[in-house]
C-alpha cells in the first residue's frame, strides 16, 4: 500500500497523509463524550477484509486518485455501527475508497502513473480504526487515536 502511495506522490507531489479508508465523518465537534462513544463502538468491531476493485481517477480534489473498494456487507456493517454518533451524514451514496493523492492533476498524467503501479491485491485486512483530526483547508491530517481490531 505505502509503495503505491509513494509512487503516486513522487509523481504528483500531493499532501502527505497516511493510507486510509474513510468510514465516517466529518464531525463538527468531537467532545469527550462523543470520543468515548466512538472508542467503545470501535472496540467491538473485529478485523475484516475489504475487496479492492481497481485504481480510479476523478476531477475532485479528495478523490482525484484512489483505489476503488467494493461495498461489502462487512464494510457496511462496520460503518453502520457508528450511525448513532454525531458525524455529518452525507447526502450522496457512500463511495468506499483508499485515497492515494489529494489535489488536482490532469487525467493523462494520472493514467500514465497507473501504468507504473503494481497490480492490486484482491483483498486487504482492516485491522485498525483511527480517529483523525482533519483540516482540509491546510491539508493537515493528525491521527488522534488508533484502535486495533480483534
What are these regions (language model features)?
Residues 60, 127, 131-137:
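Glycine-rich beta-strand-turn "strand-cap" elements at beta-sheet edges
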Residues 1-51, 69-127, 138-150:
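Basic, often amphipathic N-terminal segments
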Residues 56-66:
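Short, basic/glycine-rich phosphate-binding loops at helix/coil junctions
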Amino acid at each position: 500500500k505505502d509503495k503505491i502511495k509513494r509512487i503516486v506522490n513522487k509523481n504528483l507531489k500531493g499532501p502527505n497523509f497516511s493510507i486510509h479508508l474513510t468510514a465516517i465523518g466529518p464531525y463538527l465537534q468531537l467532545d469527550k463524550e462523543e470520543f468515548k462513544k466512538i472508542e467503545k463502538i470501535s472496540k467491538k468491531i473485529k478485523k475484516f477484509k475489504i475487496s479492492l476493485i481497481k485504481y480510479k481517477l476523478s476531477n475532485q480534489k479528495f478523490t482525484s486518485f484512489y483505489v476503488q473498494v467494493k461495498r461489502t456487507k462487512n464494510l457496511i456493517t462496520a460503518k453502520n455501527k457508528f450511525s448513532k454518533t454525531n458525524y455529518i451524514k452525507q447526502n450522496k451514496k457512500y463511495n468506499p475508497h483508499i485515497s492515494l493523492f489529494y489535489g488536482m492533476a490532469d487525467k493523462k498524467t494520472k493514467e500514465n502513473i497507473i501504468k507504473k503501479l503494481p497490480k492490486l491485491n484482491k483483498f486487504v485486512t482492516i485491522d485498525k480504526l483511527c480517529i483523525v483530526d482533519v483540516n482540509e483547508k491546510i491539508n493537515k491530517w493528525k491521527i488522534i487515536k488508533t484502535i486495533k481490531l480483534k
